[in-house]
Amino acid sequence: VYSESQDPNVSRPFRVCEHCGQPTPSHEPQCVNCQAVSLQAVVAEQEAKAERRFLRALFARATPVTYAILVVNLALYLLMSVVAGGNILTNIIKGSDSLTLVAFGAKINELVLAGEWFRLVTPIFIHIGLLHIASNSYALWIIGPLIERLYGSARYLLLYLLAGIGGGILSLIWQVAADKPSGPSAGASGAIFGLFGVIMVFSYKYRKELPPNFRSAIKSSFLPVIVINLFIGTTIPFIDNAAHVGGLISGALLTLLIPYLAPDSKRVSKLGLITIAMCALVIIYSFARAYLVSEPYLEEHKRRAGRVENISN
């Protein structure tokens, strides 16, 4: 006599066919008696096809903005290493001095409060040392293409920029409120944490339309990374964890407002091109402003370097 086990944890080698009522092997989509296809097998096959279509359409999208950001970050880092003077290789390894960082637009709270608001944008693209830019570049390389494919290049750039600004604002508020000394602050980590915030809220907001395996992979891949990085930020004193938290919150809130670009949606639109152009103009304008006020810092840097050289001679 055939009897199904009532314990869900017990492996069931047989199932009851919905059509003929006879036992048939569970791993076979068709009943061995009446050849009818299991409804569960049909549903599973439909879900598998939908997931394959979703992933094919998603990964067919290019990710030019992520690569452009990586190139800009690296180019600015190398340019700072040259402008800082001295041994370029040493500057690349150790990073530029404080005055060079400020000249290129690093965040200094007093200067931001004095009206140099462009210093909430420029720090997103400059870095303090080799390990700093290497770790941020790696993180962006991992998560950036996924977010850009999900949201499209225009929305992705907007999310990245606004999350970075949000991180800078919370860092400013936190340091001023805590009366902490203000040194040069820079790096893409606030914007990258914003992307972590995006993926967290995205996986919940669209949980009903995302393929289950894809949604599970997102949670298992990125949630531990977020927790570990926030923990590291609280244990190492020179890390601006307020910028990380600010970026994370900004990215999460923006995801509630900005819809993602479904795989069957049009990739490029006029609004998207306008968005990219506006973001690019904001970035260019911010660095232009930084250049216009950079001379005093670069002159002071040269003066100090000359004084050190005279002493050594």
Model-flagged regions — what are they?
Residues T66-A188, T235-I239:
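N-terminal TM1-TM2 helical hairpin plus the immediately adjacent luminal interfacial "cap"
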Residues S182-S203, A243:
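Membrane-interface micro-motifs in multi-pass membrane enzymes
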Residues V1-R61, L230-N313:
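C-terminal transmembrane module of polytopic alpha-helical membrane proteins
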Residues R149, F202-K219, P259-L271:
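Alpha-helical transmembrane bundle and helix-membrane interface signal
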Residues I69, N73-M80, I142, I199, ...:
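Alpha-helical transmembrane segments of multi-pass membrane proteins
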Residues A139, L158, L162-G166, L170, ...:
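Hydrophobic faces of alpha-helical transmembrane segments in multi-pass integral membrane proteins
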